[in-house]
Structure formats: C-alpha cells, structure tokens
Amino acid sequence: MLTAFARAFRTPDLRKKLLFTLAIIVVYRVGTHIPIPGVDYKNVQQCVREASGNQGLFGLVNMFSGGALLQITIFALGIMPYITASIILQLLTVVIPRLEALKKEGQAGTAKITQYTRYLTVALAILQGTGLVATARSAPLFGRCSVGGQIVPDQSIFTTITMVICMTAGTCVVMWLGELITDRGIGNGMSILMFISIAATFPSALWAIKKQGTLAGGWIEFGTVIAVGLIMVALVVFVEQAQRRIPVQYAKRMIGRRSYGGTSTYIPLKVNQAGVIPVIFASSLLYIPALVAQFAGGNSGWKSWVEQNLTKGDHPIYIVTYFLLIVFFAFFYVAISFNPEEVADNMKKYGGFIPGIRAGRPTAEYLSYVLNRITWPGSLYLGLIALVPTMALVGFGASQNFPFGGTSILIIVGVGLETVKQIESQLQQRNYEGFLR
C-alpha cells in the first residue's frame, strides 16, 4: 500500500491532485478555528473546558463540523446543512415527479438538482445559524457554564444578524471547497471534508478518555478504546465490502451484421445497502423532542420524561428507541433508493435476465426478496455499531467521549474505501498496482 501511495505521488497529475486536496483540507481546518464577530472567544474556551466532552444534543453536528460548532467559528455549521439538504432532495425525488424526471435526464438534470441542493443548503444554514446564535446567547449550548451569559456580550439585532450571515457564508465556502476537491482533487469533496471533520475530533476525545481514566493513570482505558476502535474498523471494513452478487446474462443480439451481447455480469447488492443514512436519520429524529424540551419553559411532565429517557445515551428506553429507528430507516431508505421494478425493466430492455428467473415482474419480485433478506442483517449490524459507545464503555464512564462511534466509523471507513478505490483506478490506468490486491 505504501509503495502504491509513493507511485501515486511520483505520477505528476496524481501528485497535483493529491497536493491540491491537501491544500483545501488545510484551508478548511484553518477556517474551523476562526471565531465569528460578536463572540467572546475566551469565555467560549472556558465553557468548552467545563463541558468536559459532554456536548448534549449538539454532539452530532459538532462532530460533522470538526469541533467548530462548540467553538462558534465561521465554519461552525460545517457540512451539516449540505448533508441535510442532500438527504431532503433525495427523499423528495421519490415523491415529486418533476424531480424524478430531472434525475433521469442525465448530466443536465443532475446539475439542476445540485443547484436546488445549494439553494436549500443556504436556507438551512440560515435557520441553523439563527438557532445556534439563539442557543449560544441563552447558554444551553454548553450545558451549565459559569460564564454562559457572557458568550455573546452584545445581544443586539445587528450583532445577531452579523453572526448568522458569517456562519451562512462559512457554510457556502465549505460547500465551494468540497466542490473544488470533487472537480480538481481526489475523491468526493464533501465526503473528504466529512472524513477530516470527524478525524479531527479523535485526538482530543482520546486524550479526554485518558485524563478521565483511573486505571494506571488512564492508560488502560486509553489502550482499551484504541483496541475496540481497531476491531470496529476491521468489522466495518469487512461488512461494507460484503455483497450478494446476483448473476445476470445477456442474450446475443444481431444489429446489422454484428453480434452484440452474450456476456455475463452481476448485480452487486451490499449487505449495508443503506450506508450511514439510517443512523443520521435516527439521531436527528431523536434530537427533535429533546431539543423542544430543552427550550420549553416550565416543568411539565412530558418535558421531565423526555429529559430522563431520551437525552441519556445509557437509558434503556433511549437504547431501544434508537435501535428500532435505525432498523426502520434502513428498510425505508433501501426501499426508496433501490427500485427492483426499474432494474428489472432495464434488464428486460437490454436483453438481460437472471438464470432461472423469468424477465419482467418475476425478476423484480426476486430482487425484492433477496434485498429484504440481506437488509435484515444489515440493519441489525447498523444498530449494533451505532450503540457501541454506550454498550462498550459505559463501565468506564466515558461513553460521551468515545470517538469510535457508529456514525463516525461508518463514514470514515466508507469514505476511506471510496477514495482508495479511486486512487487505485487511476493507478491502474497507468499500469501501476493499486492499494487493494
């Protein structure tokens, strides 16, 4: 692997792409440390230290921003608005016929959907930025903080608007940086930035576990977390690469004087066909009642119930609800992202068939049957991986700081494999051996 990486750097155009990607990553990481106007940065740092790694409802967004959310920087929202906008557009494509037609128009339709995604990203950034500023002003962003009311000293409307504009502009810059990587660098730009954002939180989280540990100065807990993380990475790589291959044969066709077809191929159905989307959906849905309860006044019974049962990661109700939501969204997302009838129609149109299965409706029913069977273990795997921080480290009392959570590991492994395969394909075009043998 190291030899292949060295060969990639020795290839002029690949080296240029890799260096360009690294330069964009440096710019992105610098932006995550530039505070927005109107924030008392010293008080923010004090609140972050007092939070002791427990970031409450904002932990997921803080992870996707590379720790910039709790620092209240110009990149505080990170790529979360873009991720949310992409998911919403993907869901609306199934519901709205106009968007579905655009999706089938090829490159022109994809460009139009990308434009809609950008517009929705800006709108979501304004909403999320306004919510973040309001939360920072009232201080529940950090939980209990001794200087909470002094995070935003000037609470005028002008200051609030300025902060929201800065964070929205920061989101637009992040989106632009991601597109630059996609066009001129290596890999998918937004995926690379997501990878860097998550990886950037690992060192501080690992060191916090070491500092909070009690066995051998915290080194036993530290080593245990590293070991669990490596095992999880190996498990996720194994499952993410696993797939059920449905054999497909194409009949020979005579067009003019030439014969076409007669080849054999397969349809790869991954065990984890839904990817990390169900985990993000479940996390977002669980945050809604907790977020409403956090800003609701009074001490009503439902607010107390939500705070006791849906905000604590080690509570049985939270664990069961989270697990069931992940399983449900896994089936839901697979159902809207993979259309067996469309695949069967395309196969029939081009003379393809599955051996032993008639073309048309029987093929669609067979694909649905196989997909449902492999989605069950895939959804259970997602649920168990997502609950590892709670189940594995609750004994150490450090589950809030556990960096190798389900969402982070799934994204890092997925993006890593995708990027390595892209570099490998470019190396193979130049007759070099790749990373994966």
Swiss-Prot record:
<dbReference type="InterPro" id="IPR023201">
    <property type="entry name" value="SecY_dom_sf"/>
</dbReference>
<feature type="transmembrane region" description="Helical">
    <location>
        <begin position="400"/>
        <end position="420"/>
    </location>
</feature>
<feature type="transmembrane region" description="Helical">
    <location>
        <begin position="316"/>
        <end position="336"/>
    </location>
</feature>
<dbReference type="GO" id="GO:0043952">
    <property type="term" value="P:protein transport by the Sec complex"/>
</dbReference>
<keyword id="KW-0812">Transmembrane</keyword>
<comment type="function">
    <text>The central subunit of the protein translocation channel SecYEG. Consists of two halves formed by TMs 1-5 and 6-10. These two domains form a lateral gate at the front which open onto the bilayer between TMs 2 and 7, and are clamped together by SecE at the back. The channel is closed by both a pore ring composed of hydrophobic SecY resides and a short helix (helix 2A) on the extracellular side of the membrane which forms a plug. The plug probably moves laterally to allow the channel to open. The ring and the pore may move independently.</text>
</comment>
<keyword id="KW-0813">Transport</keyword>
<feature type="transmembrane region" description="Helical">
    <location>
        <begin position="157"/>
        <end position="177"/>
    </location>
</feature>
<keyword id="KW-1133">Transmembrane helix</keyword>
<dbReference type="Pfam" id="PF00344">
    <property type="entry name" value="SecY"/>
</dbReference>
<dbReference type="InterPro" id="IPR026593">
    <property type="entry name" value="SecY"/>
</dbReference>
<feature type="transmembrane region" description="Helical">
    <location>
        <begin position="69"/>
        <end position="89"/>
    </location>
</feature>
<dbReference type="GO" id="GO:0006605">
    <property type="term" value="P:protein targeting"/>
</dbReference>
<keyword id="KW-0653">Protein transport</keyword>
<feature type="transmembrane region" description="Helical">
    <location>
        <begin position="189"/>
        <end position="209"/>
    </location>
</feature>
<keyword id="KW-1003">Cell membrane</keyword>
<dbReference type="InterPro" id="IPR030659">
    <property type="entry name" value="SecY_CS"/>
</dbReference>
<dbReference type="GO" id="GO:0005886">
    <property type="term" value="C:plasma membrane"/>
</dbReference>
<feature type="transmembrane region" description="Helical">
    <location>
        <begin position="122"/>
        <end position="142"/>
    </location>
</feature>
<keyword id="KW-0811">Translocation</keyword>
<feature type="transmembrane region" description="Helical">
    <location>
        <begin position="378"/>
        <end position="398"/>
    </location>
</feature>
<feature type="transmembrane region" description="Helical">
    <location>
        <begin position="276"/>
        <end position="296"/>
    </location>
</feature>
<protein>
    <recommendedName>
        <fullName>Protein translocase subunit SecY</fullName>
    </recommendedName>
</protein>
<keyword id="KW-0472">Membrane</keyword>
<dbReference type="InterPro" id="IPR002208">
    <property type="entry name" value="SecY/SEC61-alpha"/>
</dbReference>
<feature type="transmembrane region" description="Helical">
    <location>
        <begin position="219"/>
        <end position="239"/>
    </location>
</feature>
<feature type="transmembrane region" description="Helical">
    <location>
        <begin position="19"/>
        <end position="39"/>
    </location>
</feature>
<comment type="subunit">
    <text>Component of the Sec protein translocase complex. Heterotrimer consisting of SecY, SecE and SecG subunits. The heterotrimers can form oligomers, although 1 heterotrimer is thought to be able to translocate proteins. Interacts with the ribosome. Interacts with SecDF, and other proteins may be involved. Interacts with SecA.</text>
</comment>
<comment type="similarity">
    <text>Belongs to the SecY/SEC61-alpha family.</text>
</comment>
<dbReference type="GO" id="GO:0065002">
    <property type="term" value="P:intracellular protein transmembrane transport"/>
</dbReference>
